[in-house]
Curated annotation (Swiss-Prot):
It is found in: Secreted. The gene is gh. Pfam families: Hormone_1. CDD domains: somatotropin_like. Disulfide bonds join C71-C183, C200-C208. One of its GO terms (biological process) is positive regulation of growth. It comes from Cyprinus carpio. This is Somatotropin.
Amino acid sequence: MARVLVLLSVVLVSLLVNQGRASDNQRLFNNAVIRVQHLHQLAAKMINDFEDSLLPEERRQLSKIFPLSFCNSDYIEAPAGKDETQKSSMLKLLRISFHLIESWEFPSQSLSGTVSNSLTVGNPNQLTEKLADLKMGISVLIQACLDGQPNMDDNDSLPLPFEDFYLTMGENNLRESFRLLACFKKDMHKVETYLRVANCRRSLDSNCTL
């Protein structure tokens, strides 16, 4: 009888610990989604401020540029379209999100310079810090998803082909400034989508529609 009580106590403690971890992970997921939503909204505001500062003819010219433009993050392997995103595992979506956020940590220091006379960004270090905080949160979620298993992602320590891809942008160059902002908005939209689907995957919901 005593052994049964001890066993039941161990099982109960284990369940409580697992519930606590699940609750912590859910809070982390919710926080990550909120943070990337804020970054996506900020990116949209920045590009709107930039476009508002342009002459009508400049706007028409730039609207034709970005659909044909290349972003450095295009080198990061990611799902092609909604169907593939919905079929991707939670771990895969978290890893892609991690790499996308990581790719902007350094270039983000140049972002505020692309929007003149705007209070959208404020201190450029704040944007970099927001990205670093989100990256750290996603890293914790990845470790929780691995649950003690080794990280087999071979791309974790691989830099993008052009680490300084964005560094020449944003300084007295209309096209490149627009391209920088458009790429940032595009990538934050990707991360927001991936984290939303990953969060849905975690809840075992089979209807993770976009």
